[in-house]
From Swiss-Prot:
The modification N6-(pyridoxal phosphate)lysine is found at K247. GO terms for cellular component: catalytic complex; cytosol; Golgi apparatus. It is an enzyme of class 4 (lyase). SUPFAM superfamilies: PLP-dependent transferases. This is Selenocysteine lyase. It is found in: Cytoplasm, Cytosol. Residues 1-20 are annotated as: Disordered. Its main location: cytoplasm. It catalyses: L-selenocysteine + AH2 = hydrogenselenide + L-alanine + A + H(+). Its cofactor is pyridoxal 5'-phosphate.
Length: 432
């Protein structure tokens, strides 16, 4: 891993056709060791993991090893890891399972939907926040549209960008079945208070149990946090945790951690078929990608502190250079006082009526980045709803650019892209 940190200040010209990638929150390249693990599995473990011959047994061993690697990365147990196609499936699986569990509990108590009065509430209630990924927000909105569930979208603080624990607790109803809050926001990098939410919900569940009310489960989407900071399910206290491989230099598959899967915590399949993953997620396992995911998890377990320290150093240097170059015109949208954030994320705006974020990036010759979440790239001319939710003024949010550095980003590359941004601004409005 290249962790070079030296870079000269001053005027730096980028070689022709040189590109500097700073969109690591959108996706990451595969580490060489991950590519090797994927390739070896393709060559040597091509058999069906459910088969008894050598290639099949080797595939099964690779899957079991990867499961253990993921568990180690998050401080959980291997039997609590379910492989999925990615974060979207994992998040949908949590929501689907919670709805099913709610209705089964109602049936067991002899309270079918048509027996319960509207006042008592017949639909499961979810609590989430206003800055969640679309793979949480859209499934929940779909359930509301179909009158299958009720959802409270708790706003984040306009002071610190975090969801407030007390606001989560105040939203709990007798029919609440799930609180789902991301661990770290993909646009601002703000770390959410998941441990405190879990602790308070656990205490509340003891009171609810005495009244015969359903247990409130806690889920966090850890896509942005993994590989950038230590993530431990025991510290977080969650029932579900979403894992996304391509955010930590792994392949584009994922996994779901479920505490005591099927016993302590309910999980219901969305698909039915061959019975793989203990019937929770059937379908012949994608052995090569699982091998790569396991190797990526190993690298995180071994090097997380090194990765974190390097990214923080580079990100801080980036913000210093931006402030030095653009002075009072720069607005650091992801820097909230007293709030922890991801070590690699810098969301900023250069103030000026001609400096919309997408316009600035279009003029850049070297920088590869985005204005916000890549899944919203078709709405790049609109201010980010996440930034607006965090209290960023509309005129500032319109100009936002999200830079996210990676494991091998250097100070020299930072110097290049700051100069690139400067020339882009000059192109749009003349010299600063």
């Amino acid at each position: 891993m290249d962790v070079a940190r030296n870079g000269a200040r001053g005027s730096v010209e980028s070689p022709p056709n040189r590109k500097v990638y700073m969109d690591y929150n959108a996706t990451t390249p595969l580490e060489p060791e991950v590519i090797q693990a994927v390739t070896e599995a393709m060559k040597e473990a091509w058999g069906n993991p459910s088969s008894s011959y050598v290639a099949g047994r080797k595939a099964k061993d690779i899957i079991n090893t990867a499961r253990a690697s993921l568990a180690k990365m998050i401080g959980g147990k291997p039997q609590d890891i379910i492989f999925t196609s990615g974060g979207t499936e994992s998040n949908n699986l949590v929501i689907h399972s919670t709805v099913r569990c709610f209705h089964e509990q109602q049936t067991l108590q002899g309270r079918t939907v048509d027996q319960i009065s509207p006042e008592e509430g017949t639909r499961p209630h979810f609590i989430t926040c206003t800055v969640e990924h679309d793979s949480i927000r859209l499934p929940l909105e779909h359930l509301v549209e179909d009158q299958v569930a009720e959802v409270t979208f708790v706003p984040v603080s306009k002071v610190n960008g975090q969801v407030e624990v007390e606001d989560i607790l105040a939203a709990v109803r007798p029919t609440t079945c799930l609180v789902t809050i991301m661990l770290a926001n993909n646009e601002t990098g703000v770390i959410m208070p998941i441990s405190e939410i879990s602790r308070r919900i656990k205490a509340l569940n003891q009171i609810r149990a005495a009244s015969g009310l359903p247990r409130v489960l806690v889920h966090t989407d850890a896509a942005q946090a993994l590989g950038k900071r230590r993530v431990d399910v025991e510290d977080l206290g969650v029932d579900f945790l979403t894992i996304v491989g391509h955010k930590f230099y792994g392949p584009r598959i994922g996994a779901l951690y479920v505490r005591g899967v099927g016993k302590l915590t309910p999980l219901y399949p969305m698909l039915f078929g061959g019975g793989q993953e203990r019937n929770f997620r059937p379908g012949t396992e994608n052995t090569p990608m699982i091998a790569g995911l396991g190797k990526a998890a190993d690298l995180v377990s071994e090097n997380c502190e090194t990765y974190e320290a390097h990214m923080r150093d580079i990100r801080d240097y980036l913000e210093e250079r931006l402030e030095a170059e653009f002075g009072k015109r720069i607005h650091l949208n992801s820097r909230f006082p007293g709030v922890e954030r991801l070590p690699n994320t810098c969301n900023f705006s250069i103030q000026g009526s001609q400096l919309r974020g997408y316009m600035v990036l279009a003029q850049c010759q070297t920088l590869l980045a985005s204005v916000g979440a890549s899944c919203h790239s078709d709405h790049e001319d609109r201010p980010s709803p996440v930034l607006l939710s965090c209290g960023i003024p509309v005129d500032v949010a319109r100009n936002a650019v999200r830079l996210s550095v990676g494991r091998s980003t250097t100070r020299a590359e930072v110097d290049l892209i700051v100069q690139d941004l400067k020339q882009a601004v000059n192109q749009l409005e003349g010299p600063v």
